[in-house]
Amino acid sequence: MFTVISYFGFLLVALAFTLVTYLGLRAIQLI
């Protein structure tokens, strides 16, 4: 059970990091 929670936690962090990077690149292009 702990492994599943850890896996989903890692997936969520990876998704958030990708989203932040994507938004950051978009912001740089708009400037």
From Swiss-Prot:
- Specify where it is mainly localized: plastid
The protein's gene is named petL
Q: What's the protein here called?
A: Cytochrome b6-f complex subunit 6
Q: Which family does it belong to?
A: Belongs to the PetL family.
- Source organism per entry reads Nephroselmis olivacea
Query: Which GO BP terms apply?
Result: photosynthesis
CC terms in the record's Gene Ontology section: chloroplast thylakoid membrane; cytochrome b6f complex
Regarding the membrane, this protein is recorded as: Single-pass membrane protein
Q: How does it assemble?
A: The 4 large subunits of the cytochrome b6-f complex are cytochrome b6, subunit IV (17 kDa polypeptide, PetD), cytochrome f and the Rieske protein, while the 4 small subunits are PetG, PetL, PetM and PetN. The complex functions as a dimer.
List the taxonomic lineage: Eukaryota, Viridiplantae, Chlorophyta, Nephroselmidophyceae, Nephroselmidales
